[in-house]
Design a protein with these regions (language model features):
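Residue-level preference for hydrophobic side chains embedded in well-ordered alpha helices
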Residues: 16, 20, 24, 45, ...
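Arg/Lys-rich amphipathic alpha helix in sigma70-family domain 2
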Residues: 67-89, 98-101, 116
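A short, charge-rich alpha-helical start-of-domain segment used by transcription regulators
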Residues: 1-26, 36-39
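Helix-turn-helix DNA-binding module
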Residues: 5, 125-136, 140-161
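Acidic, proline/glycine-rich intrinsically disordered inter-domain spacer in sigma factors
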Residues: 3, 11, 93-128
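Structural recognition of an alpha-helix C-terminal capping motif at a helix-to-coil junction
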Residues: 40-47, 51, 59-71
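DNA-recognition helix of helix-turn-helix
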Residues: 70, 149, 155-179
Length: 182
């Protein structure tokens, strides 16, 4: 590959793929459970994405990048972790940034913020207890906002499986939170 096409690929990659870097980081954070591992996963995933960028026709850059990051996360976790242990240390910060982009904070009082933090903490703990396949589907749908078809594309399972995993994940969350409230 000559220098001109390499620069063109870089510019095209930056335009099409890099806008979804925050989504990739959020997914990696939920799958890995901590900032350090998520950064490693996203870095490796972006390198893989760039290396394969010219070889594919990409109709949905977001789903394409998330698929690569997901696969990188599974490979990375398989090499670097001996168990299914998920540590949660800084996902609250990531989720707060996501929430700040989506919502307004006009009528937030210290009391409602404290309640929301406690509720968010319970929800986060319940999500981390979900089996990885359920957690992944839930994060892709409810945090990343992907539709069923896109989730099926990212996870390489049928749409029916995505729907089933989401349903079961939500049932388990409701059950876990209800049990915690008692």
């Amino acid at each position: 590959m000559d220098r001109v096409s390499s620069d063109g690929d870089r510019a095209r990659f930056e335009t099409l793929v890099l806008p979804y870097l925050a989504d990739a980081y959020t997914l990696a954070g939920w799958l890995a459970g901590n900032r350090s591992d998520a950064e490693d996963i996203v870095q490796e995933g972006c390198l893989r994405a760039f290396q394969g960028f010219g070889a594919f026709t990409i109709s949905n850059p977001r789903a394409w990048l998330l698929t690569i990051v997901r696969n990188t996360a599974y490979s990375w976790l398989g090499k670097n972790r001996s168990s299914d242990l998920v540590l949660v240390d800084d996902l609250v910060a990531v989720e707060q940034k996501q929430a700040a982009r989506c919502g307004n904070r006009g009528s937030v009082t210290p009391e409602t913020e404290l309640i929301a933090k406690a509720d968010a903490s319970k929800l986060q703990a319940a999500i981390t207890e979900l089996p990885l396949a359920f957690r992944e589907a839930l994060v892709l749908r409810d945090v990343q906002g992907l539709d069923y078809r896109e989730i099926a594309e990212v996870t390489r399972v049928p749409v029916g499986t995505v729907m089933s995993r989401l349903s079961r994940a939500r049932q388990k969350l409701v059950s876990a939170i209800a049990t915690d409230e008692r």
